[in-house]
Regions:
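C-terminal low-complexity, acidic/polar tails when present
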Residues: 126-140, 154, 458, 462-466, ...
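Basic, amphipathic alpha-helical recognition segments used for DNA target recognition
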Residues: 137, 149-211, 218-221, 225-234
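Glycine- and acidic
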Residues: 126-131, 139-141, 162-175, 205-219, ...
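Terminal accessory regions of large proteins
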Residues: 276, 285-289, 297-476
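Polynucleotide-recognition surfaces of large bacterial nucleic-acid defense/processing enzymes
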Residues: 1-127, 132-143, 223-374
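Short, surface-exposed beta-strand/loop "edge" segments at domain boundaries and coil↔beta transitions
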Residues: 104-109, 152-155, 406-408
Length: 476
């Protein structure tokens, strides 16, 4: 009887891998011994030594995703710098169109803030040496797009109608089933796990997606689709509160309001929507486990590589240090109050929200964390300050007649006028501003800090400039 021995080393950095390979004690815990007979007769000759049972059976007996959808390569421009730009600089130019560019880990909806110099049927790219126009006839019938970089896992989102997809954000045409069911399957931890059994590469090709095993019945299942649809809706709502997104929609209340309550309300919306999305994502995983007929051993193998669903974590927050969490939160958020997608400290698949990240970091229930952050919000000084600065940024742009990145025109106003208008908006402005900003005045914040907040939020391509005591909104 012959056996094969494998050492499973999946740590992210080369340095960690080297340390493990040089340490006999650490290496022995990663040894996987497999009978050679397991690989005899495998239909695709793959050495999936790490999986057996239900997972191995899924690769043999399940339908392939390519039977139900067509993952496709996107167009290559040949000159990214000349042909791709942010949408707020090109919104009124008819030669430019919205594009799915990839851009990192992003599930369900989003990454719609880029544009491509397209013209008629890609005429500008066609004329560029080194470019490659692909699947032009599929643009108007393609409903999904994904990020081709799979470092954090597979992430798929809705493609907007008529949106161009390029090589870093390839498209998926649905042939059979419900689009939200497709999204639910592809954005699951299980799909990422299965994909990693097919390829160790960090770049996800269309061919590997097509080879994914899939429980066919779920792709047309109404309840499964509803879970995916709910995730899209909640992610879209979250995107609509972030100013750099084309989905941004901000309605100011009439009359005066409380600045303290406004900040708390914005934080609560983001946390509540994320918590609800995590619940639906957990339901998706549960339905897939049942559909694939995975047993406890299969689930443990999957979770050892992808981590558990954040919603399933049950740890409490009894010993949490608010100041420590507050400092972590500040590092995890952009100047615009958006979470920076990343792999959490104790997870091996990327996450998209603050609650999910903190849940993995502290092995705590996201429900407990949500309650901690909202009920003890006054203790989270840095957290509130990020949201205050984001709110002030929105107020300034709104006063300059900015409504969204696709709905704005050039304008200007004096700092004095802006300061007066903002102060009049909130009944408790002086007290809350001083509490979070210290001795800095609003005039000083606009002069010294707002430019940095704006530049960072708008990805280094600002439309707001300061000239002396005047703020300008312009495309130049």
């Amino acid at each position: 009887r012959h056996v094969c021995k494998f050492y499973r080393v999946l740590d992210p950095s080369a340095e960690l891998k080297q340390n493990i390979l040089l340490d006999t004690g650490k290496l022995s815990g990663r040894l996987v011994t497999v009978p050679q007979s397991r690989f005899i007769g495998t239909h695709d000759n793959a050495l999936r030594y790490f999986v057996n049972g239900g997972v191995s059976r899924a690769f043999v007996k399940s339908k392939k995703y390519g039977d139900f959808a067509l993952p496709m390569q996107g167009t290559s421009t040949g000159d990214h710098k000349s042909f791709i730009d942010v949408v707020w600089r090109r919104a009124h130019d008819k030669d430019w169109r919205s594009v799915s560019k990839g851009g990192g880990y992003c599930k369900w909806a989003g990454l719609n803030h880029f544009a491509i110099r397209w013209g008629k049927n890609g005429e500008f790219i066609r004329a560029n040496p080194g470019s490659a126009l692909r699947n032009l006839d599929k643009i108007y019938v393609t409903e999904l797009a994904y990020s081709d970089t799979g470092t954090n896992g597979l992430s798929v989102r809705l493609l907007q109608p008529g949106q161009v997809f390029v090589s870093s954000g390839p498209g998926i045409k649905i042939l059979y089933g419900r689009k939200f069911s497709h999204l639910a399957f592809l954005n699951s931890k299980i799909a990422t796990f299965l994909l990693r059994q097919l390829t160790p590469k960090l770049t996800i090709s269309a061919g590997y997606l097509a080879r994914l095993p899939v429980p066919a019945a779920l792709l047309s299942d109404k309840r499964f689709a509803e879970c995916g649809k709910n995730c899209v809706s909640l992610k879209t709502k979250a995107n609509s509160r972030k100013i750099k997104n084309p989905e941004f929609h901000w309605v100011q209340r009439t009359g005066r309001s409380s600045l303290r309550m406004t900040i708390a309300g914005e934080i609560a919306k983001d946390l509540d929507d994320e918590l609800e999305r995590l619940k639906h994502e957990a339901q998706i995983e549960e339905m897939l486990v049942r559909a694939f007929r995975f047993d406890r051993a299969d689930v443990e193998a999957i979770e050892s590589e992808t981590g558990r669903c954040a919603y399933a974590l049950t740890g409490t927050a009894n010993s949490f240090d608010s100041a420590h969490i507050d400092a972590k939160i500040r590092r995890k958020l952009t100047a615009g109050g958006e979470y920076k997608p990343r792999k959490p400290e104790n997870g091996s698949v990327g996450c998209e929200g603050l609650l999910e990240d903190l849940a993995f970091t502290y092995s705590a229930s996201p429900r407990v964390l949500r309650n901690l952050l909202t009920k003890q919000l006054p203790e989270f000084h840095e957290f509130r300050r990020v949201y205050l600065e984001d709110l002030l940024h929105k107020e300034v742009l709104h006063l300059l007649c900015f409504r969204s990145v696709t709905k704005w025109s050039s304008g200007q106003a004096s700092i004095g006028k802006i300061v007066s208008a903002i102060r009049q908006r909130y009944t408790d402005f002086p007290a809350v501003f001083k509490e979070l900003m210290g001795s800095t005045t609003l005039e000083e914040w606009i002069t010294n800090k707002l430019p940095d907040v704006h530049i960072n939020t708008f990805l280094g391509k600002p439309i707001l400039t300061l000239d002396g005591a005047t703020l300008h909104l312009s495309r130049s």
